[in-house]
């Protein structure tokens, strides 16, 4: 293994940004899609979760915190898109780089933890509904949510103590790039391996285990009750579970596996410039994939939550109704009755948006 000084000099003499012409177009393009979709989708999800329930429970608390973490995460993307659009150049200073890094990593791993909590909560609701009922009480869940935010904040605050920007040989200033960390932490490979295990390995195993048991239990329930199977509820629940697991694994696995394999190689032998270049490119690709999770979560809400789906459809109907109302109003000056009828329909739709809806499918009554 290289010494920190040699490792730093090695990365400085190795051109890690040959893919700049492609990255400065594709990455901002991806972020320009993820950011608005993620912000709008999660804002709507948060609105549905908060406004469409008469009683706060564990599911609504975890879902609301997940939506908040996704929204805050999306807020870090515009400046990151500017950075990539400028060809890996950060002209906004060290302080703002640290602030964006903190916002990025804090909400990324807060989201992972809240997704894990949702999996455990649904598992407890089905397998141990009476024995572990205290864990699902709103008062206790609030403490769990607060503990998650504080824990992830404590893990990411050290980022503020180190320099995250670096002036490259071509005078460009990079921000939050892997080579900027080399030489700062002596045991960087060990630290990142532990971080991957704690921040991704344990959560993904927990999520897969909980949802696998849930799927098995739902399958058993469907076999013993044909009426339940014919209703399609268990089939829908299994589909939702598969979607949640699929989105989590596809979005988060490549990034963490990429880091893990490279850190293991660094511990086994001295990696060369070509390997570091490949790792740098793969990091930029897998980070984009990980960011995609923040705008896919609302689609999981859409299919899993009745209230979310109905509110989206009603808002779309209201927009269509308003459009046709405007067209008729301008084209038919004498068509007063039709216009009034359209307005009445719009008012009905707007009133229905405020109705209480079932937030999320839960596998058993609690």
From Swiss-Prot:
Disulphide bridges, residue numbers: 97-175
Record's GO cellular component terms: plasma membrane
Organism of derivation: Danio rerio
Transmembrane segments annotated in the record for this chain: 25-50, 71-88, 99-120, 143-161, 188-210, 237-260, 281-305
Annotated protein name in UniProt: G-protein coupled receptor 183-B
Bilayer topology term: Multi-pass membrane protein
Gene Ontology MF terms: G protein-coupled receptor activity; oxysterol binding
Keywords annotated in UniProt: Adaptive immunity, Cell membrane, Disulfide bond, G-protein coupled receptor, Glycoprotein, Immunity, Membrane, Receptor, Transducer, Transmembrane, Transmembrane helix
Role noted for this protein: Probable receptor for oxysterols that plays a central role during humoral immunity. Promotes activated B-cell localization in the outer follicle and interfollicular regions.
Subcellular locations according to the entry: Cell membrane
Main location: membrane
Domain of life: Eukaryota
Phylogenetic placement of the source organism: Eukaryota, Metazoa, Chordata, Craniata, Vertebrata
Stretches in topological domain Cytoplasmic: 51-70, 121-142, 211-236, 306-366
Family assignment from sequence similarity: Belongs to the G-protein coupled receptor 1 family.
Pfam family, one: 7tm_1
Segments on the Extracellular face: 1-24, 89-98, 162-187, 261-280
InterPro entries per record: GP183-like (IPR047160), GPCR_Rhodpsn (IPR000276), GPCR_Rhodpsn_7TM (IPR017452)
GO aspect biological process, one term: adaptive immune response
Glycosylation site list: 9
């Amino acid at each position: 293994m290289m010494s920190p000084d040699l490792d730093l000099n090695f990365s400085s003499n190795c051109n890690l940004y040959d893919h700049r012409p492609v990255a400065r177009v594709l990455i901002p393009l991806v972020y320009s899609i993820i950011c608005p979709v993620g912000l709008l989708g999660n804002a709507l999800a948060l609105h549905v979760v908060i406004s469409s329930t008469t009683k706060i429970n564990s599911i609504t608390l975890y879902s609301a915190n997940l939506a908040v973490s996704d929204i805050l995460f999306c807020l870090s993307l515009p400046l990151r898109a500017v950075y990539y659009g400028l060809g890996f150049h950060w002209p906004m200073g060290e302080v703002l780089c640290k602030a964006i890094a903190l916002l990025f990593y804090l909400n990324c791993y807060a989201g992972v933890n809240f997704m894990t909590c949702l999996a455990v909560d649904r598992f407890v609701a089905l397998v141990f509904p009476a024995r572990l009922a205290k864990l699902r009480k709103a008062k206790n869940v609030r403490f769990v949510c607060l503990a998650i935010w504080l824990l992830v904040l404590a893990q990411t605050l050290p980022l503020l103590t180190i320099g995250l920007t670096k002036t490259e040989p071509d005078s460009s200033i990079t921000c939050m790039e892997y080579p900027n960390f080399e030489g700062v932490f002596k045991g960087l490979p060990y630290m990142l391996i532990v971080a991957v295990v704690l921040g991704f390995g344990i959560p993904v195993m927990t999520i897969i285990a909980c949802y696998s048991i849930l799927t098995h239990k739902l399958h058993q329930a469907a076999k013993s009750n044909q009426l339940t199977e014919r209703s399609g509820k268990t089939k829908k629940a299994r589909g939702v579970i598969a979607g949640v697991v699929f989105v989590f694994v596809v979005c988060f696995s490549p990034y963490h596996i990429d880091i893990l394999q490279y850190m293991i190689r660094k511990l086994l032998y001295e990696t060369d410039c070509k390997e570091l270049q490949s790792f740098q490119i793969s990091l930029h690709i897998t980070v984009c994939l990980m960011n995609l999770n923040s705008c896919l979560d609302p689609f999981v809400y859409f299919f899993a939550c009745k209230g979310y789906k109905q509110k989206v459809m009603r808002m779309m109907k209201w927009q269509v109704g308003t459009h046709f109302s405007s067209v008729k109003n301008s084209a038919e000056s004498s068509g007063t009755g039709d216009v009034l009828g359209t307005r009445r329909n719009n008012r009905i739709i707007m009133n229905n948006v405020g109705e209480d809806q079932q937030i999320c499918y839960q596998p058993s009554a609690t």
